[in-house]
Amino acid sequence: MRLFFALWPDADTRAQIANAAAALRLAGDAQRVPRENYHVTLAFLGEVTTSQLAVLQQIGRGQRAAGCTITFNAYDYWPRHQVAVAIAREAPAALTLLWTQLHRDLVLHQAALNLKRPHSPLRTHITLARKVAQAPVLQAMSPFHWNARSFSLIRSDTSGPRSVYTVVDTWQLLYE
């Protein structure tokens, strides 16, 4: 199974993301991401076995990070990946801490996990469209806020015509 750790939005946040995505002007054959697939990736894990899944769930349970509010305030286009994204120009300290702890624990458990993929830096974004071959007009975005109260382990099924994401497990973030 193909897995990743992510922030997974609640219904209100999903609606805000959908509004931002609808306002983005795309050209050509760009494909908008279905609203049920919106997320912020914390760590892409790739193909994982059942025994590795147990270790990943242990890592998820072990995180002690605070919840936070993320302000998404700009559109961006990444030509190398051919995606249009909503970005947060500044990541909250609590999100950076969660990302750092999660990646530290993935490295600490590397012997049990044997993950092949390198860890990429934190780039707080939500993919809004894929196969964007032509740079969209990046107008100003109406900012929206995501109150991150939990993070999840997500399964990605790419066997059909489009990716289907399923929540495998969720852990609450701490609030004081």
Task: Identify the function of each model-found stretch.
Residues 1-176:
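Histidine-dependent nucleotide/RNA phosphoesterase domain, centered on the 2H-phosphoesterase fold
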